[in-house]
Amino acid sequence: MANFEALYDDSQMPLRGTKNSAGYDLYAHEDAIVPAKGRILVKTGVKCWLEPNRYLAVVPRSGLALKQGITVLNTPGTVDSDFYPNEVGVILCNTTDTDFEVKKGDRIAQGIIHEYITTDVDNVADKERTSGYGSTGVK
């Protein structure tokens, strides 16, 4: 089971474009500028509750990538089940030489819910998640 929850009264809930779409469109909850050759974190205004052994993969929208040169850095962005109750953000990267304007309500990425399995001998660091975006360190 998985659910998206609005964090604000004006949050746009993720939506699948068609009944056979795998991805839920994720919407910007703020205006932003993705600088030329730069990257920013854009908030979505939603959080995602996931059962253990599920995660949300945040991936680029093909139209933004092809037509505008805007992609998602660290693709797929992995939102683990223990990331809840934090707001889902999207790391947008501009591959062009021109700043790109994001308006609140723009579709900026897709979220695909996946199930995963672990190994029989599951080695887990003795840590509790305190936030996201690199909170478990690099070493």
PLM regions: where:
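DUTPase catalytic domain/fold
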Residues: 1-139
